[in-house]
Amino acid sequence: MLELKKREVKVSEKQIETKGRKWAVDHGWYCRKFTSPAHRSVPDRLFLKDGIVVFIEFKKPGNVPTKAQWEEILEIRSKGGRADWTDSVERMIEILEGRHEEWHPPS
């Protein structure tokens, strides 16, 4: 008997970021790629809606931010900003809607 194997679908960081951006724009968020020439490791995207600014670092499923990326996220938080990271569109939606638990770097 022929056995069929499930094809593992690999999702890239770019695919998550693209789908997430589309969802955000469709739901009224101003969304821009975020870069800072003098600083490496800043979050990938800036989102703005109703006076709320959120920075999000995107990762492919199963990956986590680097130490430098964590430092940037924590720096933004220390100044009262909202910053987090995601490895899925679903989590990005939770972050933007403010119904998530902040993730913290491993101890």
Q: Residue ranges of each PLM-predicted region?
A:
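Catalytic phosphate/metal-binding cores of nucleic-acid and nucleotide-processing enzymes, i.e., regions
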Residues: 1-107
